[in-house]
Regions:
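Lipid interaction determinants
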Residues: 12-79, 88-138
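Acyl-CoA/ACP chain-elongation machinery
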Residues: 83
């Protein structure tokens, strides 16, 4: 009887974790992927970089639930890169061509500090660098 309790209890914890994972994945799929974004705010050590991104539209395209292509479009020019996330969707790695100077700031590992759309707020992953990136869904 006691062994059955622990066995059932262990299964329910796994089921709860799987359900939480499914909710996170569904939110990311529905609200982050395949949506158009613009830079709402970009600061690097207090310097406002937002104007550098004026006119750009960014789109994270679903490849798998954890990675895929990203596009940055300005006028008719499209730049291609990649994005990836971790299993709990708390991290977003953006890689864009660093031949475009404004993409150097964006191409890094970010952590989500807020996903309250229409604005997703990001800060550097694993560091306290004073960098901020806010992306607004269009």
């Amino acid at each position: 009887m006691i062994a059955s309790f622990f066995l059932l209890n262990g299964c329910s914890k796994s089921a709860i974790e799987q359900a939480q994972q499914n909710v996170l994945q569904q939110y990311f799929d529905d609200n982050i992927l395949n949506q158009n974004y613009r830079v709402h705010l970009a600061t690097d050590n207090g310097a406002d970089l937002t104007s550098q991104y004026s006119g750009y539209v960014f789109r994270l395209i679903k490849g798998t639930s954890f990675d895929g292509p990203v596009t940055a479009t300005i006028n008719t020019t499209v730049y291609n890169g990649t994005w990836s996330t971790n299993s709990d969707y708390s991290k977003l790695t953006i890689t864009l061509p660093t031949t475009v100077p404004e993409f150097i700031f964006m191409s890094r590992e970010w952590k989500f500090t807020h996903k309250a759309l229409p604005i997703m707020e990001l800060a550097p992953w694993g560091t306290t660098e004073p960098k901020v990136l806010h992306m607004e869904r269009l």
